[in-house]
């Protein structure tokens, strides 16, 4: 036998469902990405290390060439 809700219970239930829906909408990933765009710091750090290592390789080649042709 189904339970009959009182009007105050029905209102509370409706309000609860509205709050749940609102919370789900505000916690969505799209909204989070819109508020907090991904940073470029990891990419910048990676580029720095790539440039640093390629500079070291170029210096090593130059040093080898200088010792080879001297």
Curated annotation (Swiss-Prot):
Interacts with target proteins during their translocation into the lumen of the endoplasmic reticulum. Protects unfolded target proteins against degradation during ER stress. May facilitate glycosylation of target proteins after termination of ER stress. The gene is tam14. Belongs to the RAMP4 family. Keywords: Endoplasmic reticulum, Membrane, Transmembrane, Transmembrane helix, Unfolded protein response. It is a single-pass membrane protein. It is found in: Membrane; Endoplasmic reticulum membrane. The chain crosses the membrane at residues 45-65. Residues 1-19 have a biased composition (Polar residues). It comes from the Eukaryota. Residues 1-20 are annotated as: Disordered. One of its GO terms (biological process) is response to unfolded protein. It comes from Schizosaccharomyces pombe (strain 972 / ATCC 24843). This is Protein tam14. Its main location: membrane. The keyword Transmembrane applies. Induction: Differentially expressed during meiosis. GO terms for cellular component: endoplasmic reticulum; endoplasmic reticulum membrane.
């Amino acid at each position: 036998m189904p339970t009959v809700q009182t009007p105050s219970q029905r209102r509370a239930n409706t309000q609860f469902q509205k709050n749940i829906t609102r919370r789900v909408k505000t916690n969505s990933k799209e909204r989070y990405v819109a508020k907090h765009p991904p940073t470029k710091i990891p990419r910048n750090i990676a580029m720095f290390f790539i440039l640093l290592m390629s500079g070291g390789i170029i210096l090593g080649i130059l040093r080898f060439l200088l010792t080879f042709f001297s």
